[in-house]
C-alpha cells in the first residue's frame, strides 16, 4: 500500500510540476551582475544530514546516467555533470525536504543566477520530483519525468550541462532537483 501511495503521489506531483512549473523553466535569463546568496539548511532541519554520503552521490550519478541514456535513445548529445550546478540543485532538494520551501520550482531564477556567477548561460530549465517507499527512488523519478511532457521536454532540450541534487528527509521522502543549462 505504501508503494502504491508513493507512486500516486509521484504521479500527481509530476503532473502538477509539468503543468505549473516547467513552462517557466524555459525562460532565458541574463547572467547576473551581483552574486546572490545561496540556500542553506535551517537549524534543526529535518533533512537528513547525510546528503553528502555515498548513497546520495550514487543516486545522483545514477540519475545522470539514466538521463544521458534517455538522451542517447533520442540521438541527443550527453549532458556533462557539473558540481557547481549540482550544489545548487542539492540545496533546493534540501530546502524542499525540510519544508523551508514547498515542493515546487520556487527560487528557480535565483538558482540559475547563482549558477551564472561561474557558468555563463543562455538558457536553463529544471525538473523536480519526490517519492517514498521504493527500493529504486532514482529510477522512479526519472521514469516519472519521462512520462510527463513538460519534464521530458527539459530532458530533450538543447542543453549541454546539468547538475543533480538528491536528499532524503526524516520521513524517508526522497527529493530530486535537476537543473539543465545551455552554456554560452
Regions found by a protein language model. Give the residues of each.
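N-terminal targeting leaders of exported, membrane, and organelle-targeted proteins
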Residues: 1-102, 136-139, 157-184
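Short, surface-exposed glycine/acidic/tryptophan-bearing loops
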Residues: 87-135
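Short active-site loop/helix that positions an aromatic residue
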Residues: 152-156
Amino acid at each position: 500500500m505504501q508503494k502504491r501511495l508513493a507512486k500516486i503521489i509521484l504521479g500527481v506531483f509530476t503532473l502538477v510540476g509539468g503543468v505549473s512549473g516547467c513552462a517557466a523553466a524555459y525562460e532565458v535569463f541574463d547572467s547576473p551582475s551581483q552574486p546572490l546568496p545561496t540556500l542553506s539548511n535551517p537549524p534543526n532541519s529535518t533533512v537528513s544530514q547525510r546528503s553528502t554520503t555515498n548513497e546520495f552521490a550514487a543516486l545522483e550519478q545514477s540519475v545522470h546516467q539514466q538521463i544521458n541514456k534517455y538522451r542517447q535513445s533520442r540521438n541527443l548529445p550527453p549532458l556533462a555533470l557539473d558540481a557547481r550546478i549540482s550544489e545548487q540543485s542539492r540545496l533546493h532538494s534540501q530546502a524542499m525536504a525540510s519544508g523551508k520551501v514547498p515542493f515546487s520550482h520556487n527560487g528557480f531564477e535565483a538558482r540559475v543566477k547563482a549558477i551564472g556567477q561561474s557558468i555563463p548561460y543562455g538558457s536553463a530549465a529544471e525538473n523536480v520530483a519526490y517519492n517514498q517507499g521504493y527500493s529504486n527512488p532514482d529510477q522512479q523519478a526519472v521514469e516519472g519525468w519521462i512520462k510527463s511532457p513538460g519534464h521530458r521536454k527539459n530532458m530533450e532540450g538543447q542543453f549541454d550541462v546539468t547538475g543533480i541534487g538528491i536528499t532524503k528527509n526524516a520521513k524517508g521522502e526522497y527529493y530530486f532537483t535537476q537543473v539543465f543549462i545551455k552554456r554560452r
